[in-house]
């Protein structure tokens, strides 16, 4: 249970509640749990490969998987959603994600304070976003699912397993 600071802890908790809970209500606990854990795993593996000296703290990979899966869900079910604020929801999610990634990049490359240790990496955020979009388009339910979408699900799942 480590985070960079109260800002990251609060931001991650807020996004998990605002985005994760509605996604769970629509798509079920199992799918969203798998999505979140895949984002955390991909974020951790990406940091261990690309930025080996940076510590991995927090659940940003999972949070970004949830956020980008939410964006994929809105795009995938655009016509079937009855919410009049679809575009506003997407813009707000993108602004929140961009501001947190910008903060993480700033913390990583700014000179550390004398009392602080190495700054955490931002690569977990990016890996979580990639996992969220790719898995969100495949494992989340489409309101108008077609056979070609089911075939695409198996192809992306196989590719995802291969890359892990």
Swiss-Prot record:
Keyword Hydrolase assigned to the entry: answer is yes
Short name of one Pfam family: Rhomboid
Keyword Chaperone among UniProt keywords = no
Bilayer-spanning residue ranges: 10-30, 32-52, 56-76, 120-140
Gene Ontology BP term (one): proteolysis
Q: What class of enzyme is it?
A: hydrolase
Catalyses: Cleaves type-1 transmembrane domains using a catalytic dyad composed of serine and histidine that are contributed by different transmembrane domains
- Enzyme Commission number(s) of this protein: 3.4.21.105
Q: Where is this protein primarily located?
A: membrane
GO CC terms in record: membrane
Q: Name one GO molecular function term.
A: serine-type endopeptidase activity
Q: Which residues form the active site?
A: 60, 125
- Protein localization: Membrane
Which family is this sequence assigned to? Belongs to the peptidase S54 family.
| Function recorded in the entry | May be involved in regulated intramembrane proteolysis and the subsequent release of functional polypeptides from their membrane anchors.
Name of the protein in question: Rhomboid-related protein 1
Provenance organism: Rattus norvegicus (Rat)
**Gene transcribed to yield this protein:** Rhbdl1
């Amino acid at each position: 249970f480590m985070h960079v600071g109260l800002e990251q802890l609060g931001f991650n908790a807020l996004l998990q509640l605002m985005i994760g809970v509605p996604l769970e209500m629509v798509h079920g606990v199992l799918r969203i749990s798998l999505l979140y854990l895949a984002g955390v795993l991909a974020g951790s593996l990406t940091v261990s490969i690309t930025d080996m000296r940076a510590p991995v703290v927090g659940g940003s990979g999972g949070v970004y998987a949830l956020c980008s899966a939410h964006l994929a869900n809105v795009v995938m079910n655009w016509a079937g959603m009855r919410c009049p604020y679809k575009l506003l929801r997407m813009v707000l999610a993108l602004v929140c994600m961009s501001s947190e990634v910008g903060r993480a990049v700033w913390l990583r490359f700014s000179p550390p304070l004398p009392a602080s240790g190495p700054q955490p990496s931002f690569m977990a955020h990016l890996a979580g976003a990639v996992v969220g979009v790719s898995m969100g388009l495949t494992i989340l339910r489409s309101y108008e699912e077609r056979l070609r979408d089911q075939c695409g699900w198996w192809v992306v799942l196989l590719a995802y397993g291969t890359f892990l």
